[in-house]
């Protein structure tokens, strides 16, 4: 499968009704908050990426794969809303726990440009890779928490 640029309509074409509503909501929110969106076809599925215009960095990715819709949030400002992490569902915390450990934080073995994430949820300390730490499967239970997470990060970047 070749990598190809897609329109938003092409990107959302195969989604079920629940996922479509979620994606449309997030898409509108991101555009209304000054983010630029791109959509592509990749080998492993479809990728939607949103870059924050102020920070010029990706704030989130939407990934449509065979097993469902995933959201990857780049939580660069988690220190500004760390209490929010304590509200995440058990399934979301398990997803964070199973994410890769940050090689740079643990043994200085990764790129110096990658800071990784160092945070706590409850009494548990995490040092995780930024590329899969906050990657969540969208479902009825996780959707409102994912939306709130995106809002927290977007607000923190806008205020910076």
Q: Positions of the model-derived regions?
A:
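Charge-dense, helix-prone N-terminal extensions
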Residues: 1-160
């Amino acid at each position: 499968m070749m990598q190809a640029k897609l329109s938003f309509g092409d990107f959302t074409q195969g989604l079920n009704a629940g996922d479509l509503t979620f994606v449309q909501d997030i898409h509108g929110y991101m555009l209304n908050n000054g983010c630029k969106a791109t959509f592509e076809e990749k080998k492993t599925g479809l990728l939607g990426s949103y870059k924050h215009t102020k920070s010029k960095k990706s704030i989130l990715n939407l990934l449509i794969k065979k097993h469902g819709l995933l959201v990857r949030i780049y939580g660069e400002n988690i220190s500004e809303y760390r209490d929010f992490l304590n509200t995440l569902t058990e399934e979301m915390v398990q997803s964070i726990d199973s994410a890769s450990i940050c090689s740079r934080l643990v043994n200085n073995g990764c790129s110096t440009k990658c800071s990784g994430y160092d945070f706590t949820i409850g009494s548990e300390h995490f040092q995780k890779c930024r590329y899969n730490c906050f990657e969540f499967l969208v479902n009825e239970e996780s959707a409102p928490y994912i939306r709130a997470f995106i809002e927290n990060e977007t607000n923190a970047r806008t205020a910076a």
